[in-house]
Amino acid sequence: MTNDNSGIWVLGYGSLIYKPPSHYTHRIPAIIHGFARRFWQSSTDHRGTPANPGRVATLIPYEDIIRQTAFLKNVNLYSESAPIQDPDDLVTIGVVYYIPPEHAQEVREYLNVREQNGYTLHEVEVHLETNREHEAELGEALEQLPRHNKSGKRVLLTSVYIGTIDNEAFVGPETVDETAKVIAVSHGPSGSNYEYLAKLEQALAQMPIMKERGRITDHYLTALLETVNKYR
């Protein structure tokens, strides 16, 4: 979450993409550089139980990926930019929501409760995929943001909840097959683990974002969903 003079920005890369916070007025697709999305965070409070933890998404930073051979092998397996040699080789699609000031505190409190079980706040830069409607309606808020010198996209420095590799709920690295077997059978207070994954994949499919090589695709997520379907 990041404040400006008019409200706050909320970044999502997992369930927030298809289950947004209340009171948002605008939803903008965004590209997160330098991180890979993986279902390596266990869930005992939403998509699993303490006895049978599920799996939910977290972001793995470039620095951790290149330091651990198993992480790098997994990321290279599903990356269009393999072998990974630079933070910009890692591209993850997310969304940012704009929350007006009168609802900012309510949304902060809601997210602090929702994003528990090992998640902590971190700052990341995202490149916004704005359109003419966004620019017209959020003119003042967007004009405060710098543009990237290569892409020309507006760059937002914002806070996001991440399950780091040293938190007690982190279970990676796992193969897609290992993770899929857990997701296929896990349920929690928020519903089935499969629903979480399927809705995220569907939401991303409806957000076509293009780069030099064509449409950005999360091949890891696609492989994970296909494998889960084999075990259901």
Curated annotation (Swiss-Prot):
Gene3D superfamilies reported in the protein's UniProt record: Gamma-glutamyl cyclotransferase-like
Cited function: Catalyzes the cleavage of glutathione into 5-oxo-L-proline and a Cys-Gly dipeptide. Acts specifically on glutathione, but not on other gamma-glutamyl peptides. Allows utilization of gluthathione through subsequent cleavage of the Cys-Gly dipeptide by Cys-Gly metallodipeptidase DUG1.
GO CC entries: cytoplasm; nucleus
Protein name, UniProt field: Glutathione-specific gamma-glutamylcyclotransferase
EC number: 4.3.2.7
A molecular function (GO) term: gamma-glutamylcyclotransferase activity
Catalytic residues (UniProt): E115
Keyword annotations: Cytoplasm, Lyase, Nucleus
Gene name as annotated: GCG1
Note: Present with 1300 molecules/cell in log phase SD medium.
Enzyme class: lyase
Binding site for substrate: V10, L11, G12, Y13, G14, S15
Record family assignment: Belongs to the gamma-glutamylcyclotransferase family. ChaC subfamily.
